[in-house]
Amino acid sequence: MAGNVQEKQLRWYNIALMSFITVWGFGNVVNNYANQGLVVVFSWVFIFALYFTPYALIVGQLGSTFKDGKGGVSTWIKHTMGPGLAYLAAWTYWVVHIPYLAQKPQAILIALGWAMKGDGSLIKEYSVVALQGLTLVLFIFFMWVASRGMKSLKIVGSVAGIAMFVMSLLYVAMAVTAPAITEVHIATTNITWETFIPHIDFTYITTISMLVFAVGGAEKISPYVNQTRNPGKEFPKGMLCLAVMVAVCAILGSLAMGMMFDSRNIPDDLMTNGQYYAFQKLGEYYNMGNTLMVIYAIANTLGQVAALVFSIDAPLKVLLGDADSKYIPASLCRTNASGTPVNGYFLTLVLVAILIMLPTLGIGDMNNLYKWLLNLNSVVMPLRYLWVFVAFIAVVRLAQKYKPEYVFIRNKPLAMTVGIWCFAFTAFACLTGIFPKMEAFTAEWTFQLALNVATPFVLVGLGLIFPLLARKANSK
């Protein structure tokens, strides 16, 4: 009894803070401001009220329902819908990281450029093919690092992540108060209520996927439900606190961006270099030169490296660690003496290399390539969130079978409606997000659209091939 009480020591504020560090980042503010300008303030309010809050609480119920499961989403699907769909969920969770892995070395290069040169000129000095070749070399190097299991790098990454988190909050505080403390002039003039109201047109709709991408990943906090004291009350309280904290940071951060960058004339490379521009301007406001920007660039470099190494290794081991031989060939699961899944790493390398080099055939500018890959992530990554809502809908249908300690909505029809809404909204965001955010029907727009349509189908479709290969191997 004493042991059980000792295990459940997390309070609602612990849950809120742990979740906040996991879910939120300064890049979310910059990327969505680059897409929408100050209109994003309205978008944040909508997303947090009608999507993120129910999403987080749904994760809480699923984590409580399957408190002994170690596979996350795939465990939830396995218990509710069988091993076949559980395999597809696990495959989706892994394969959507491929565009993420292809984009991370780019982010490392950009951060290094700002840390060393104090500006964003590094990616302008070389051709796209040369830069993407260097990106591929970086990826191969960090794949080797991941295979060595360097724990010290993860510790450095954690410290860097905390530093970035603190600096993100510092940015909001210093930028919002700058007009009162310094003589800085607000870049966006004539701000009225109409400044924040979006024009609901096709251009606006195509940017929703980036908002969904920004607030996703709450399923990572599900293991903490059953470590929480009085989870039926404290966990949802922590989640609501999380939603308020993220909403405040998103809204104030967006307002701060509006003070620095004219909402009606957003720089074309803001998505690529905006984080560094922001800290550079902040240093100018307070007569600190490039100090804040360099500190942030160094912390971001280390954080991106750690995130890349972790994302190469962890999702793959989740997929292969508890692999069912009916769905995944044994050859793919083969490991070397250090426990590295060699063939799994090779498959990752092939897919990432294609995604790094193929776009250079039709995208001739590094800034556009970076933005394209980031937008592709906003289309592909939320596909894994769909399985969360599928699992929730299944749990609601099987309500008599499961008796979790925490239940989000006890009214079955209402719970089903919320689950379907979250699933439909995520799917809608993914579908509309495939359209490139640039002048339509140009050669590059068509090329990007083709890649945006083909990539999710190819990546998820590969998952349908492996069960056939496994069946063939097992028959021998």
From Swiss-Prot:
GO terms, molecular function: transmembrane transporter activity
Superkingdom: Bacteria
Cellular localisation: Cell inner membrane
Keyword presence, Protein biosynthesis: no
Pfam families for the chain: AA_permease_2
CC terms in the record's Gene Ontology section: plasma membrane
Residues spanning the membrane: 10-30, 39-59, 81-101, 126-146, 155-175, 196-216, 241-261, 292-312, 344-364, 376-396, 415-435, 449-469
Protein keywords: Cell inner membrane, Cell membrane, Membrane, Transmembrane, Transmembrane helix, Transport
Record topology, Cytoplasmic segments: 1-9, 60-80, 147-154, 217-240, 313-343, 397-414, 470-476
Bilayer topology: Multi-pass membrane protein
Periplasmic side: 31-38, 102-125, 176-195, 262-291, 365-375, 436-448
The family this protein is said to belong to: Belongs to the amino acid-polyamine-organocation (APC) superfamily.
Protein name: Inner membrane transporter YcaM
Organism taxonomic ancestry: Bacteria, Pseudomonadati, Pseudomonadota, Gammaproteobacteria, Enterobacterales
